[in-house]
């Protein structure tokens, strides 16, 4: 939210207050779901610091982690009405408004982060989505970052897709995650995230799927001794700014914000890439056995789900899927 300072400045000068202690010209807010120990927060801190430095103190960004301002849907609405300035959202999250955007979370459709970038910025589908974010939702996309890839932990080794059969797999209550479990032959078991550790510990479920950072943060490795690198859903994170905020900034400060967001996204991506490499070593030291099943049968098992997606989303969904599949290696 823009903070108007002209009146304050005039008043301060009349009272003899030094300009050195005056507030920034633009006092902005960045809301996010992630907590203070997360890579997202660390990258947002870097973003805020660079913006302040490069704007010579004209822009001050305060961070609001841990869903203090609501969930991601609520924060996107706040960006639209101008009551919040910045937030994060995954590309797939825009399925809330455009069902075809769920393509970003279809298991095995986005094979790596390079594909994720091309899917968003190079395909006609991606370019159109960015335009709709701007026109319909009142948000400008500043940059995209890698945010981890979902893997599968279990109480038995997963060496091939055959080992998934009958596995009671905890998943969030989201269509794409439920579909992953269902079509690879597991038994999907939706459950609140806060309940997962105990469910794994008591064998109420046999496994779960999450990015490696979440596996470590929640200490699932204490109660699951097998980790299969299933690479089934790649997550990204978009740096978003309210159009109302962005358009009120002078052109030179818009560039400061844009450049800082791109730099923060690179740092964000590095944190996750380096972190995932380190975490594999960490889990091995904790006695977790890492397996690398052949993923070709996993992807092949998703064909019925892709057909279901196309049926639900029509020509837009079909076009999105074809365009992204065309850039997969």
Swiss-Prot record:
The record's listing under SUPFAM superfamilies reads: Periplasmic binding protein-like II
Per the record, the domain of life is Bacteria
GO cellular component terms? Answer: outer membrane-bounded periplasmic space
* Annotated GO biological process: transmembrane transport
Residue positions annotated to bind N-acetyl-beta-neuraminate are 33, 72, 90, 150, 170, 210
The compartments listed are: Periplasm
Per the UniProt entry, the signal peptide is: 1-23
Could you tell me which Pfam families the record lists for this protein? DctP
Keywords attached to this Swiss-Prot or TrEMBL record, sorted alphabetically, are: Periplasm, Signal, Sugar transport, Transport
The record, for InterPro entries, names: DctP_fam, TRAP_DctP, TRAP_DctP_sf
Disulfide bonds, which pairs?
none
The entry's family comment says:
Belongs to the bacterial solute-binding protein 7 family.
Q: How does it assemble?
A: The complex comprises the extracytoplasmic solute receptor protein SiaP, and the fused transmembrane protein SiaT.
Q: What does this protein do?
A: Part of the tripartite ATP-independent periplasmic (TRAP) transport system SiaPT involved in the uptake of sialic acid (N-acetyl-beta-neuraminate). This protein specifically binds sialic acid with high affinity. N-Acetylneuraminate (sialic acid) can then be incorporated into the lipooligosaccharides (LOS) as a terminal non-reducing sugar, protecting the bacterium from complement-mediated killing by normal human serum.
Name of the protein: Sialic acid-binding periplasmic protein SiaP
Q: Which organism is it from?
A: Haemophilus influenzae (strain 86-028NP)
**Lineage of the species this protein comes from:** Bacteria, Pseudomonadati, Pseudomonadota, Gammaproteobacteria, Pasteurellales
Q: Which gene encodes it?
A: siaP
